Regions:
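Alpha-helical transmembrane bundles and membrane-interface segments of multipass inner-membrane proteins
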Residues: 1-160
């Protein structure tokens, strides 16, 4: 039952980001809105044709296929872990990572770019220009949970 919950949560999170991206696509270009009453978090529409921060945007086919392969590998790893007992932290991390990976991969294949929409105002102009989406946060949080899971596993193993 827990495995179904994990798979359902993964699908829900991916669909949530895809739905938000569909709404963001209706926004006018170049418009920036504050998120709620925040002065630091802004919403804006950015089309990213590359990977993180438009890296490799000159090679859209490479980016599309690399994204597809990596999302597939992450999904297989997630499915293999879901079959085992324990490792809840790793399973949660993989589920988050898979949700973010597929959300961005589907964007690349359906639109030809990834829709990013969350930015942060900082004192550094370069950092302020970086724009994210929920899928990016899912990937980052998932990576942290996987690393934490591995760290705790090795720590416990070493203390026995």
């Amino acid at each position: 039952m827990k495995n179904l919950f994990g798979a359902g949560a993964t699908a829900f999170l991916a669909c949530l980001d895809i739905a938000v991206k569909s709404e963001v696509e209706k926004w006018p270009d170049e418009e920036e809105k504050p998120f709620a009453d925040s002065k630091k978090i802004v919403l804006r529409k950015v089309h990213n044709k590359g990977m993180c921060m438009s890296i490799l945007k000159e090679y859209p086919q490479f980016v599309k296929y690399t994204s597809l392969v990596m999302a597939g590998i992450l999904t297989v790893w997630d499915l293999l872990c879901l079959r085992k007992k324990g490792s809840s932290l790793k399973k949660a991390g993989l589920s988050l990572g898979v949700a973010g990976a597929w959300s961005n991969t589907l964007d690349r294949w359906m639109r030809g770019y990834v829709v990013d929409y969350i930015g942060f105002r900082t004192s550094d102009e370069k950092l302020t220009k970086i724009t994210y989406n929920l899928g990016d946060f899912f990937l980052a949080a998932g990576s942290i949970l996987i690393l934490l899971s591995e760290f705790l596993h090795n720590f416990r193993k070493g203390s026995k």
